[in-house]
């Protein structure tokens, strides 16, 4: 254990040093035409109160909630099948489909969704050929497209966490419910689902945090029409070279993420008692 302390301490120091540098930049004034920041100021944080930036924060939080919710809706059946399926081939297929995206970069996965959601992409081509639509649907550069692609990004970790929780549930609980007259659906709703709440909480909070920090997916799929905090930080830092304001936006985003995750954990704490002990 002591052998691992030094590397962990070095990593922690690296993260703290980077955070301190960003904090220091966020409290400095922007000097137009210069990459060097000016003196101490709180103007960067007061500027975040403007409706434009407040709207970006609200949109980002809403997209994070949507992504976490739909990732849970898609991931739970996959995790359940992965744990309880008796067919080895089916288990292997689910595992490969779920885990493979982890071996691909976010940019690669995002470009694959451009191929799927574009005006000449797979979805529109199938709908046009089937006669269901007469002209391509606008799926790119929309919130729907961004959330869809982000669900694909966060799905593997959701399935892994849910599968870990489901695998620790003793099947005797379900058998006991069945022996008392509960059908499969009622047994799932009254036994399996409550006992898997620790995995649900872990998966949802992780998906929320990953989505909040996502950059490539909203940048490429959103195309500048769906603004999130990470994209705005990029625009301010590398297009306007306003690094102090970009740093203040990063700090505010980090604080908001911790606040929302803290509220989610506090709201879900009463449910954790249903988990397996």
Task: Tell what function each PLM region has.
Residues 1-33, 48-167, 191-215, 222, ...:
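Membrane-water interface segments at the C-terminal ends of transmembrane alpha-helices
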Residues 180-182, 194:
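Glycine/proline-centered hinge or cleavage motifs at structural transition points of membrane proteins
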Residues 169-173, 272:
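Short glycine/proline-centered loop/turn elements that form peptide/ligand docking sites
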Residues 32-38, 215-242, 277:
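Glycine-rich helix-loop "coupling/hinge" segments at transmembrane-helix boundaries
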Residues 40-49:
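A short amphipathic helical element positioned immediately N-terminal to and/or at the very start
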Residues 267-277:
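Short cytosolic juxtamembrane segments of multi-pass membrane proteins
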Residues 177:
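The alpha-helix within a helix-turn-helix
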């Amino acid at each position: 254990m002591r052998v691992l302390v030094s590397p962990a301490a070095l990593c922690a120091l690296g993260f703290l040093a980077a955070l301190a540098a960003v904090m220091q930049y966020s409290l400095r004034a922007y000097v137009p035409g210069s990459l060097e920041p000016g003196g101490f100021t709180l103007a960067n944080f007061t500027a975040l109160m403007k409706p434009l930036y407040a709207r970006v924060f609200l949109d980002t939080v809403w997209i994070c909630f949507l992504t976490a919710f739909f990732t849970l809706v898609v991931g739970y059946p996959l995790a359940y099948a992965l744990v309880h399926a008796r067919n080895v081939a089916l288990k292997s297929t689910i595992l490969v489909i779920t885990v493979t995206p982890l071996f691909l970069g976010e940019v690669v996965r995002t470009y694959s969704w451009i191929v799927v959601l574009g005006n000449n992409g797979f979805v529109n081509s199938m709908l046009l050929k089937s006669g269901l639509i007469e002209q391509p649907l606008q799926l790119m550069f929309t919130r729907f497209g961004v959330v869809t692609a982000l669900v694909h990004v966060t799905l593997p970790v959701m399935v892994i966490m849910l599968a870990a929780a489901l695998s620790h549930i003793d099947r005797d609980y379900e058998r006991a419910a069945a022996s008392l007259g509960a059908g499969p659906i009622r047994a799932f709703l009254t036994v399996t689902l409550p006992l898997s709440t620790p995995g649900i909480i872990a998966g949802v909070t992780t998906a929320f945090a990953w989505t909040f920090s996502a950059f490539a997916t909203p940048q490429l799929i959103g195309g500048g029409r769906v603004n999130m905090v990470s994209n705005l930080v990029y625009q301010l830092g590398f297009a306007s070279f306003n690094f102090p304001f970009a740093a203040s936006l990063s700090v505010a985003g980090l604080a908001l993420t911790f606040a929302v995750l803290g509220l989610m954990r506090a709201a879900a704490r009463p449910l954790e008692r249903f988990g397996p002990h």
